[in-house]
């Protein structure tokens, strides 16, 4: 089975930038997958198809995390390593790992302070509408969830991109990261 690294974090944390940098290295037997590549439906469509909980961390995100994990399992079974990025709740990741019997996944939260996030969203990405209190609260929520789950956190506001890429490549190639265990079965 290939190595599996998931990077999560709020908008502006550097997930796509870092994942693209890893992708550009063209590591042998390694695929990079982007959560948003499946397309993000409108709020109305999410509400219609998945009910309440269409906001970040809601029912749609959970359903897509489970769906993606099924795809990834088949790739890992072929001996190919996978880097997966997206704004994913750790609770959903853990549930999906359990459902798909994937052990040894490396989960990394990419995070930065609110000022850095705002600067990136406004200046670098030209999406100032995302630099709002809801996004800052979402990033804080993911940070707290990562701390509680003892997930590795990389501060992309302080670390150079090259260092973040190095850490992720190390996880993909040598397993040098903390592993998130599947959710324990209730007895």
Language model regions located:
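Hydrophobic anchor at the beta1->P-loop junction of P-loop NTPases
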Residues: 7
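Conserved substrate/cofactor phosphate-moiety recognition/catalytic segment
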Residues: 20-69
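Small-molecule kinase domains that catalyze NTP-dependent phosphoryl transfer to phosphate-bearing small molecules
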Residues: 127-167
């Amino acid at each position: 089975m290939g190595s599996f690294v998931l990077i999560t974090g709020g908008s502006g944390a550097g997930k796509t930038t870092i994942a693209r940098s890893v992708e550009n290295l063209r590591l042998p037997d390694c695929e990079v997958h982007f959560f948003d590549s499946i397309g993000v439906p409108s709020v109305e469509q999410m509400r219609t198809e998945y009910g309440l909980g269409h906001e970040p961390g809601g029912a749609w995100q959970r359903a897509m995390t489970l769906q993606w994990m099924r795809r990834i399992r088949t790739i890992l079974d072929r001996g190919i390593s996978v880097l997966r990025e997206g704004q994913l709740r750790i609770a959903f990741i853990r549930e999906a790992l359990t459902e798909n019997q994937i052990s040894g996944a490396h989960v990394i939260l990419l995070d930065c302070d609110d000022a850095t996030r705002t600067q990136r969203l406004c200046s670098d990405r030209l999406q100032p509408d995302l630099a709002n209190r809801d996004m800052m609260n979402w990033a804080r929520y993911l940070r707290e969830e990562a701390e509680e789950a003892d997930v590795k956190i990389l501060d992309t506001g302080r670390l150079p991109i090259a260092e973040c890429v190095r850490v992720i490549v190390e996880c993909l190639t040598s397993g040098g990261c903390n592993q998130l265990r599947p959710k324990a079965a209730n007895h």
